[in-house]
Amino acid sequence: MSEQSSSRYQQLQNEEEPGENPQASTDAPPPYSSIAGESSGLFDYKDELGFPKPPSYNVATSLPSYDEAERTKAEATIPLVPGRDDDFVARDDFDDADQLRIGNDGIFMLTFFMAFLFNWIGFFLSFCLTSSAAGRYGAISGFGLSLIKWILIVRFSTYFPGYFDGQYWLWWVFLVLGFLLFLRGFINYAKVRKMPDNFSTLPRTRVLFIY
């Protein structure tokens, strides 16, 4: 009886196991050697696409140092013409310092009469004591008119006989010289006096007066 039961409960062979083994073998990853052989062409293709490669030793050693790179960067940030931005600041009018350098009509008339009445002494005093354009141009103009005055006095006075006898060209030279000095001082002051109106809307300008 026991033998019949043992034969009845014999272990059956699993029929699914042989089928799972081929599937497991197909799911296993391929060996590394086969992957390396198949993908070597792909890696070579990526290199040919232009990916950056490290520079050679010669190129790496020829690169600028850190100090040179910083110096180049600092030079690039420096403007080509330094200090020019201050020269282009718009101005509404001349300031007080510019007005003192130009002067006014009162200074011009004062130095004019000083040079005219006191001749060359008044000219040197008024020219050296004043630093404005009006004062110096007034001194020049007054000295020119004073020179004309003395030429006429010497020419037509009976107290100085024989000064221009036979030398009338010298009389004309001094007369023309005095007239030119008078006109130069008067005309130049008239031009300088109009500068505040002409330069009021222009950028800041440095003006050099040549007397």
Swiss-Prot record:
Cross-referenced InterPro entries: NEDD4/Bsd2 (IPR019325)
GO biological process: metal ion transport; vacuolar transport
Principal subcellular localisation of the protein: Golgi
Coiled coil segments of this chain: none
Extracellular-facing ranges: 128-133, 184-211
Region (Disordered): 1-48
UniProt keyword terms in alphabetical order: Golgi apparatus, Membrane, Repeat, Transmembrane, Transmembrane helix
Keyword Transmembrane helix recorded: yes
UniProt xrefs under Pfam families: NEDD4_Bsd2
Membrane topology: Multi-pass membrane protein
Subcellular location: Golgi apparatus membrane
Motif PPxY motif 1 positions after renumbering to this chain: 29-32
Residue intervals on the Cytoplasmic side: 1-106, 155-162
TM segment ranges: 107-127, 134-154, 163-183
Positions with biased composition (Polar residues): 1-13
Motif (PPxY motif 2): 54-57
GO CC aspect terms: Golgi membrane
Function comment: May play a role in Golgi structure maintenance.
PANTHER family the record matches: NEDD4 FAMILY INTERACTING PROTEIN 1/2, NEDD4 FAMILY-INTERACTING PROTEIN 1
Protein name (Swiss-Prot/TrEMBL): NEDD4 family-interacting protein 1
